[in-house]
Regions:
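Beta-sheet entry/capping signal
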Residues: 77-79, 168-170
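Charge-dense polyanion-binding interfaces
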Residues: 205
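Short coil/linker segments at helix-helix boundaries
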Residues: 45-73, 87-126, 132, 136-163, ...
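Extreme N-terminal leader/anchor segments
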Residues: 1-74
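Extended, hydrophobic/aromatic-rich amphipathic alpha-helical segments that build helical scaffolds
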Residues: 78-90
């Protein structure tokens, strides 16, 4: 299992652009209608919609009773299903933690791996309920990285995302994580992906920021390599 130095399943997407008063600061027992309306109000602005889904996932980590009631009241809701699938991935990652793989207990790693297939299944179910929504595909890309999908499998998932939203910010960030050297790629593959995103970005898109994430990822790894070299050098003297 490759390691990640970031807490959770990867970098966050843009902050929702709604005013603080319109965001659900909490979802107390059974109060799911505000959450449903909050996501629905984003319409087909898929980046904004995903940002709202991410916020609901965070709220559900504290108390998911409202989410269960939402799903019970509207089992056909793709939004509720997407929040649930993302929550499952986040909970799996919370058990694994952000430490290097060799520092994660075998029990935690086993539980992490055992939870991920269910999260992937939940994301597929969400995509069937909301076939036009790229959100479930972001969840799939996140889970696929930890499930060790090969390059072909992952590329097919990413193609599914792009069919729905070719410039989706969070989807590209998850893909960048997959292609970086600490997971299933290399520096070359990571930069190739980032350059393609940069070249494809339409005017005004935030997608060129993916390249900045690649530079940051490379810088962090270079810094860790330098620290390791310095420690080895000091140990030899």
């Amino acid at each position: 299992m490759p390691s990640s130095t970031r807490t959770g399943p990867g970098p966050r997407g843009p902050t929702p652009t709604t005013t603080p008063s319109s965001r659900p600061s909490s979802a107390p027992a059974g109060e799911w209608k505000q959450a449903a309306a909050y996501v629905e109000a984003a319409g087909q602005d898929w980046d904004e919609r995903w940002s709202r889904v991410e916020l609901l996932q965070e709220l559900a980590q504290e108390d998911d009773d409202w989410l269960k009631r939402w799903r019970k009241a509207h089992p056909e809701s793709g939004d509720a299903a997407t929040v649930r699938a993302g929550l499952m991935v986040h909970r799996a990652w919370a058990i694994r933690g952000s430490a290097y793989a060799h520092k994660v207990s075998q029990a935690h790693m086993d539980t992490f791996q055992r939870m991920l297939p269910d999260a992937m299944k939940a994301a597929h179910e969400a995509s069937e309920l909301a076939p036009a929504d790229p959100g479930p595909w972001v969840v799939m890309l996140t889970a696929a990285r930890a499930l060790n999908y090969d390059h072909g499998q992952f590329s097919r998932l990413f193609a599914g995302l792009q069919t729905r939203a070719p410039y989706h910010w969070a989807g590209h960030l998850q893909a960048l994580q997959y292609w970086c050297a600490k997971w299933h790629g290399s520096d070359e593959l990571m930069y190739d992906f980032a350059k393609r995103a940069l070249a494809a970005a339409p005017p005004g898109s935030v997608l060129p920021g993916v390249y900045l994430y690649a530079l940051d990822e490379d810088g962090q790894r270079s810094g860790r390599r330098r620290m390791g070299t310095e420690r080895r050098t000091r140990g030899c003297c």
